[in-house]
């Protein structure tokens, strides 16, 4: 074979290889296109069945090592359309309280990145329930946790995370700079209220879906403060109560009506012999009921009920089963303030059922320990101390703290009534546990059910002190 023939032969072979390679590439492209078409058709079929594939990601940080666990669940389609929460249902009939959530945040925080918090509370939309809390701008077991017993500082912020999860930087959403706060959902968006600033000039910042819509300046210049639990939304309007003035004497109390973050009406309560702080509010048949803290002179709890026009009634829970802390032994109640051990107090709640009342309270009369729910069938109007049901949820030997109400609307539960629920803060650290340099808390929550429940204790359970405390 002469040189020219060799060149022609080699060229022919190379061309043949090139053609074969081109054919293979075309085949590969066709294969990918067919595969994509099959997948697209499968997804369209899923859509026809009204199902969604939702990926939930739980992220855990241990010793700065990031572990991502992804679980894919096929979930029957849930309507995420915005809707106005009516709030006109009555409370569901209940026989007791079922455990709903427990975040164990102090236990987890001994080794993980968990916020130092206080004043946690829960609020639900028509799609989800979230835990809201006031951070101290610090993590547990870190040097910045020192001195976090202080209530008001520029480092505090309202944040939220999915209910039942320990609040950490990786699952939490910033809501507002605040050392006093409230939040609620009207079916279309979250309203948040965050109060921050100096004691003699604090400002409440209202946000709707994360955008500032309104501000309220302290009108008495004596520590403007709000509920530390959820506000209430009825037919597109949301309602909250704020206090400004002394914590040990008559103060000023205002109810605000808010629509999409804008104040549409407000009134001041005419209640010279009452004291309203840190109110726990809920909707019931289109009206709003708030049960509050009397830090001035009552060991029973004051209440205020109002309609959407802000026409209101006020009073005190009459039962001889007293709900505040400190408080005297149960005995003769009053529909006015019970002055015995009436000074100071703690945030709490009750649910009214006609003349009856479910009273949530610490088990201890004098310290923030234990927690129990008591059903007094005539306690809203009668002054005796007889009750029918007592359910223990935190033992007398374990720390508790603030407590408050929240509800689950029929739009969330599918029930034809408003499900009553409550949360309990489990405070750890200072000022009671002096082996620590910090103050923080975890939380538990319960919801009312018309079925069997149990007496038990669900304490915080963290072993103190932490490494930073030694």
UniProtKB/Swiss-Prot annotation:
GO biological process, one term: carbohydrate metabolic process
Disulfide bridge map: 92-417, 124-129, 184-231, 233-238, 279-292, 281-290, 318-335, 421-447
Catalytic activity, reaction form: Hydrolysis of alpha-(2->3)-, alpha-(2->6)-, alpha-(2->8)- glycosidic linkages of terminal sialic acid residues in oligosaccharides, glycoproteins, glycolipids, colominic acid and synthetic substrates
Enzyme class: hydrolase
Keyword hit for Cell membrane: no
Region span, Hypervariable stalk region: 36-90
Side Virion surface, residues: 28-470
Activity regulation text: Inhibited by the neuraminidase inhibitors zanamivir (Relenza) and oseltamivir (Tamiflu). These drugs interfere with the release of progeny virus from infected cells and are effective against all influenza strains. Resistance to neuraminidase inhibitors is quite rare.
Annotated spans, Involved in apical transport and lipid raft association: 11-33
Active site: 151, 402
Record keywords: Calcium, Disulfide bond, Glycoprotein, Glycosidase, Host cell membrane, Host membrane, Hydrolase, Membrane, Metal-binding, Signal-anchor, Transmembrane, Transmembrane helix, Virion
Intracellular or extracellular location(s): Virion membrane; Host apical cell membrane
Record-annotated membrane-spanning stretches: 7-27
Family classification: Belongs to the glycosyl hydrolase 34 family.
Comment field (misc): The influenza A genome consist of 8 RNA segments. Genetic variation of hemagglutinin and/or neuraminidase genes results in the emergence of new influenza strains. The mechanism of variation can be the result of point mutations or the result of genetic reassortment between segments of two different strains.
Protein name: Neuraminidase
Protein species of origin: Influenza A virus (strain A/Leningrad/1/1954 H1N1)
Designated gene of the protein: NA
